[in-house]
């Protein structure tokens, strides 16, 4: 159930990260422009996803971090460090450690995350609905994501 709710967000996260990286590479040459653009992106992401993310359970949030790592190839710590700063990454790592979590932990498809990797394989192969039905005898609930790209206002900067 957690996977079904969270994986679509990780897939959208991958698309948005690629969009941000592409915009930075093509249109942002100065550090101040980059910082302004990243700040605008952050505001847009909060506007789009804050309600949904805050509505997730702790386990769903942890799974989302793992799946974002799988899709983007970066731990939550590395993403924060890359797009914000080392200071921000260290701050959030400290907060995570207070709750016995680690933003630096990586997705391990052959080890502790092998079961999650199998679920990703089933989803990506297009067999998710029948797999879900075989377990729960009902169709999987759909996660509705408002948008999969950043708005044009963010892209223009």
Across the structure, where does each feature detected by a protein language model lie?
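Alpha-helical structural motif
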Residues: 9, 16, 41, 45, ...
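Early exported N-terminus immediately downstream of N-terminal targeting peptides
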Residues: 1-37, 42
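Amphipathic, charged alpha-helical segments and their helix-to-coil junctions
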Residues: 62, 69-154
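Short, charged/polar micro-motifs that form catalytic or ligand-binding hotspots
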Residues: 6, 35, 39, 51, ...
């Amino acid at each position: 159930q957690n996977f079904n709710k969270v994986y679509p967000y990780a897939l959208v996260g991958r698309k948005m990260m690629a969009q941000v990286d592409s915009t930075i590479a093509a249109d942002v040459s100065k550090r101040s422009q980059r910082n302004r653009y990243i700040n605008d992106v952050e505001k847009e992401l909060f506007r789009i996803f804050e309600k949904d993310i805050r509505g997730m359970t702790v386990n769903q949030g942890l799974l989302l971090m793992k799946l974002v790592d799988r899709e983007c190839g970066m731990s939550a710590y590395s993403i924060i460090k890359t797009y914000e700063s080392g200071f921000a990454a260290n701050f959030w790592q400290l907060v995570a450690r207070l709750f016995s979590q680690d933003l630096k932990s990586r997705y391990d498809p052959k080890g502790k995350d092998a079961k999650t990797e199998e679920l990703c394989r089933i989803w990506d192969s297009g067999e998710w609905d029948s797999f879900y039905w075989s377990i729960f005898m009902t169709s999987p609930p759909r996660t509705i994501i408002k948008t999969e790209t950043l708005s044009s206002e963010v892209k223009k900067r």
